[in-house]
A protein has these predicted regions:
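Short, Lys/Arg-enriched N-terminal segments with co-localized hydrophobic residues
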Residues: 1-13
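Conserved catalytic core of two-metal-ion nucleotidyltransferases
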Residues: 18-42, 87-147, 167-173, 183-255, ...
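Active-site nucleotide-donor binding segment shared across nucleotidyl transfer reactions
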Residues: 38-71, 80-81, 227, 255
Length: 303
């Protein structure tokens, strides 16, 4: 099946905290993937958390936000590195592809767990024909933030440059002239030193951490006390139980404000990340279709 826009709209039925509903096929597959990721992390005592809209869904809906079609997890950089060294090898390579940041076919500064033999192809034309485009879970690193205010702002700015360079390399398409110009201006800048500045791997005692590589627009929505990522609690999510921040109220308030309040009915729409969604066939079978697609509306996501 292709043309995810109309399919996602049909599948995104409303649910409240008290009401039960049937998951869309896409959400059901994401939940299955999350369970496998969770089992691998628990086996190796790797600390991760549901993050962003997925954490909001856990708290407010005890599962997916009904009109959402993605799944996000986050780890402190040290745990993130351990995930790839210890947990990722536990995942069945016949079913999963681990798309790690810095890989030969993935220029972004976060990673994805992809499901083989599926397609979740977004609204752009990849420059790299070998990029895996299966259904995915986003895996975000959380990095050390300097204790010096001026250096923090420098880290934020450096992350914007790194992201712009990565988006250009990936083939990101936008109708924003400002974004196009910024990506072009960033192209000659060195990526390695900027990445190291953003990560500050040696600064493991910093009081604050950041998610600048998740590409949030506002500085204050991407910086958190380290304890928010170190301290977790299990919370029901659909028919499973998964870790969220023990400080979820403060975290979600920072991200969303009054997160308990549901959006107006007209705003409860699927994000429609995918231009082509196929849960039964590989993205490889849709490459020619993707090549010939034109996009009237570009995704605002970096994913």
């Amino acid at each position: 099946m292709s043309g995810a826009g109309s399919q996602n709209t049909r599948e995104c039925e409303m649910k409240t905290t008290e009401q039960k509903r049937e998951l869309s096929p896409h959400q059901a597959l994401l939940l299955e993937m999350l369970k496998d990721l969770d089992a691998a992390c628990r086996k190796h005592a790797i600390r991760y958390q549901l993050f962003a809209g997925t954490a909001l869904g856990a708290v407010r809906h005890r599962g997916f936000i009904p009109w959402d079609d993605d799944l996000d997890v986050i780890l402190l950089r040290s745990e993130y590195d351990r995930f790839f060294e210890e947990a990722a090898p536990e995942l069945d390579p016949e079913r999963y592809y681990v798309q790690r940041e810095g890989g030969s076919h993935w220029p972004m500064q976060f990673s994805k767990l992809r499901r083989n033999n599926t397609a979740c192809m977004e609204k752009y034309h990849p420059k790299d024909p070998c990029i895996h485009q299966g259904v995915y879970i986003d895996i975000f690193p959380c990095d050390n933030l300097s204790d010096a205010p001026a250096m923090r702002q420098l880290q934020f700015a450096a992350a914007k440059v790194v992201i712009a360079k990565a988006l250009y390399a990936r083939g990101y398409e936008t109708d924003s002239m400002a974004k196009k110009l910024f990506m072009q201006l960033c192209r000659p800048l060195p990526r390695g030193p900027l990445e190291r500045l953003c990560m500050r791997k040696e600064d493991t005692a910093s009081q604050m951490v950041h998610t600048f590589f998740a590409a949030g627009k506002k500085y204050e929505k991407n910086v958190f006390p380290r304890s928010w990522l170190e301290e977790s609690m299990d919370m029901p999510f659909e028919d499973g139980t998964f870790p969220v921040s023990a400080h979820y109220d403060a975290l979600l308030t920072r991200l969303y404000g009054d997160y308990h309040r549901l959006p107006a009915p007209e705003e409860r729409k699927c994000k429609e990340h995918a231009a082509i969604l196929d849960l039964e066939h590989s993205y490889v079978e849709h490459l020619e279709e993707q090549k010939n697609m034109t996009f009237e509306v570009h995704t605002r996501s970096i994913r």
